[in-house]
């Protein structure tokens, strides 16, 4: 962990992507390397998904499953975001795991990580499946 924090501390400030901004409650990007813990927290919280897609079986009949968006708590959001960051870090070419994770966190802060695409995909599926929430609630009442 100390290697990751040292890399974040010594890295140049991230060039943020306006299409994928960090959350507004954190300090601006040029100040982030001064406090690597906030850097790490800002990257994780910014890429964390708001919902997950749960497949409800037996609602549509015929063996088909119905996607239903379910809101996530803070701990679940952060855990999912960290899993996405680690899976993206595994695909990097650096030799040490700490270097790969640190570079992936920097890529998240700059809006270049594949975790942003995963987040966008999950949110897009959640928006398209939001009408299914009512269907499952009506089924339960019967």
Put a short name on every predicted segment.
Residues 2-142:
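Strongly charged
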């Amino acid at each position: 962990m100390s290697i990751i924090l040292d890399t974040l501390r010594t890295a140049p400030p991230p060039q943020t992507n306006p299409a994928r901004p960090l959350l507004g409650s954190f300090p601006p990007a040029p100040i982030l390397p001064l406090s690597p813990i906030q850097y790490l927290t800002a990257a994780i919280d910014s890429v964390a998904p708001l919902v997950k897609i749960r497949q409800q079986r037996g609602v549509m009949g015929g063996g088909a499953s119905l996607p239903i968006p379910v809101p996530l708590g803070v701990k679940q959001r952060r855990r999912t975001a960290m899993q996405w960051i680690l899976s993206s870090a595994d695909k990097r070419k650096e030799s040490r795991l700490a270097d790969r994770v640190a570079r992936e966190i920097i890529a998240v802060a700059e809006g270049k990580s594949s975790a942003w695409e995963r987040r966008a995909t999950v949110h897009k599926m959640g928006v398209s499946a939001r009408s299914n929430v009512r269907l499952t609630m009506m089924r339960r009442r019967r």
